[in-house]
């Protein structure tokens, strides 16, 4: 169980008058809170103690200690201190039935007592997480989290990918303890298979900052996929080719079938689960090979086109990038280059036309200026003739 923690609050003091005039005795106690299974100390403080009888009783009013002498045979209770200043007892392995008021009684001519209240908290155990029904890609999964016993009622939280999920919680009180449950729903896909969902429980019985957690690994079922990997890119007559059918799916397909189009597999072929071995290749082995896998959620098939070359043939290894994609990229580059060239030619022609227009305009202006100058000169001559 968790370590005991004690929270103490001062009680109202009980003042008792002693028998003799001018004397008074005081008894003071403190309330104690402890986690179930922990250790609690119950203390009675004495003031102006004159040696009178001191009795400690449990909530059932059974005497535990009488003036320092054990009266009840419960070894969980031990007398730690008995002095004129205080009486202190120690309770180990605290239980819910130990909860209640402990009486510290001082017997004089008038009996006086004070009560120390013991409160026992129950820390939650690790939550129990269950799934309502099998999760399938594209659907929803519902998880439930249960803490059957806690006091006070535990607070439940859900986390997924370090983010809190909103759950619906409910609680039921059973005697002194609470049973708390929470449910959460969310949509799942195949990428969620193997993901972690956490249910966390907290209450005051746990140390500050601590919690009890349970991790649930998502099991999401989905249809299979298949892909064929070849042991080499270029094969020639006489080579041995190994084809591997890489299959995924949940549940994982337990049977893989190999075929070659509408023909049967070569007699030399060895099909063993995910691998197909073709030894001593010849041109007659050419064809389209397929692997097929299925589970209850779907079916998958992968293709591989086998081309067996002559031993002396010079060929390039097959690329994983389809030729159509490469051709499309090249066509796009050529188109962009043509667009750039057309734009450059158009800009050049426009700039040249603007320059010729400006030059012609300049010539017109110069002609007009020259004509004006000549006209101006003739007028001057006429003026000279007039005055002569």
Curated annotation (Swiss-Prot):
Occurrences of domain Ig-like C2-type (ranges): 124-219, 224-307
Ig-like V-type domain: residues covered: 21-119
One Gene Ontology cellular component: synaptic membrane
Annotated keywords: Cell adhesion, Disulfide bond, Glycoprotein, Immunoglobulin domain, Membrane, Phosphoprotein, Repeat, Signal, Transmembrane, Transmembrane helix, Tumor suppressor
Residues with PTM Phosphoserine: 361
Glycosylation sites: 31, 67, 286
Keyword Phosphoprotein included in the entry's annotation: yes
Transmembrane segments: 325-345
UniProt key word Repeat: yes
Signal peptide interval: 1-20
Extracellular side: 25-324
Entry-linked Pfam families: C2-set_2 (PF08205), Ig_3 (PF13927), V-set (PF07686)
Residue ranges, Cytoplasmic side: 346-388
Paired cysteines (S-S): 44-104, 145-199, 245-291
Entry PTM: N-glycosylated.
GO molecular function: protein phosphatase binding; receptor tyrosine kinase binding; vascular endothelial growth factor receptor 1 binding; vascular endothelial growth factor receptor 2 binding
Gene Ontology terms describing biological process: homophilic cell adhesion via plasma membrane adhesion molecules; negative regulation of peptidyl-threonine phosphorylation; negative regulation of peptidyl-tyrosine phosphorylation; negative regulation of vascular endothelial growth factor receptor signaling pathway; negative regulation of vascular endothelial growth factor signaling pathway; regulation of cell motility; regulation of cell population proliferation; regulation of Rac protein signal transduction
Family indicated by similarity: Belongs to the nectin family.
Function: Involved in the cell-cell adhesion. Has calcium- and magnesium-independent cell-cell adhesion activity. May have tumor-suppressor activity.
Oligomeric and partner information: Monomer and homodimer.
Protein name: Cell adhesion molecule 4
The species this protein was found in: Rattus norvegicus (Rat)
Biological classification of the source: Eukaryota, Metazoa, Chordata, Craniata, Vertebrata
């Amino acid at each position: 169980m968790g370590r005991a923690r004690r929270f103490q609050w001062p009680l109202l003091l009980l003042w008792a008058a002693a028998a003799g005039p001018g004397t008074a005795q005081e008894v003071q106690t403190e309330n104690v809170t402890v986690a179930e299974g922990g250790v609690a100390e119950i203390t009675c403080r004495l003031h102006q103690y004159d040696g009178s009888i001191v009795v400690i009783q449990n909530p059932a009013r059974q005497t535990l200690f009488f003036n320092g002498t054990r009266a009840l045979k419960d070894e969980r209770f031990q007398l730690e201190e008995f002095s004129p200043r205080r009486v202190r007892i120690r309770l180990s392995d605290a239980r819910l039935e130990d909860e209640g008021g402990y009486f510290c009684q001082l017997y004089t001519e008038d009996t006086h007592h004070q009560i120390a209240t013991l409160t026992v908290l129950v820390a939650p155990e690790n939550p129990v997480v269950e799934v309502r029904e099998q999760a399938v890609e594209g659907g929803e999964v519902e998880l439930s989290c249960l803490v059957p016993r806690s006091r006070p009622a535990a607070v439940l939280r859900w986390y997924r990918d370090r983010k809190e999920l909103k759950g619906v919680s409910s609680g039921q009180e059973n005697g002194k303890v609470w049973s708390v449950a929470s449910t959460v729903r969310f949509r799942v896909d195949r990428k969620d298979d193997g993901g972690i969902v956490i249910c966390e429980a907290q209450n005051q019985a746990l140390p500050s900052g601590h919690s009890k957690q349970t991790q649930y690994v998502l099991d999401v079922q989905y249809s299979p996929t298949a892909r064929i990997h070849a042991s080499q890119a270029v094969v020639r007559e006489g080579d041995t080719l190994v084809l591997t059918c890489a299959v995924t799916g949940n549940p994982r397909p337990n049977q893989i079938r190999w075929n070659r189009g509408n023909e049967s597999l070569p007699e030399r072929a060895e099909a063993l689960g995910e691998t197909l071995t073709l030894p001593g290749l010849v041109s007659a082995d050419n064809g389209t090979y397929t692997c097929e896998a299925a589970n209850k959620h779907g079916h998958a098939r992968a293709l591989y086109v086998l081309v067996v070359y002559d031993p002396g043939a010079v060929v390039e290894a097959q690329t994983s990038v389809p030729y159509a994609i490469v051709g499309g990229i090249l066509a796009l580059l050529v188109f962009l280059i043509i667009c750039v060239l057309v734009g450059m030619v158009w800009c050049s022609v426009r700039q040249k036309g603007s320059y010729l227009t400006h030059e012609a305009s300049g010539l017109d202006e110069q002609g007009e200026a020259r004509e004006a100058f000549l006209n101006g000169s003739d007028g001057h001559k006429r003026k000279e003739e007039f005055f002569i």
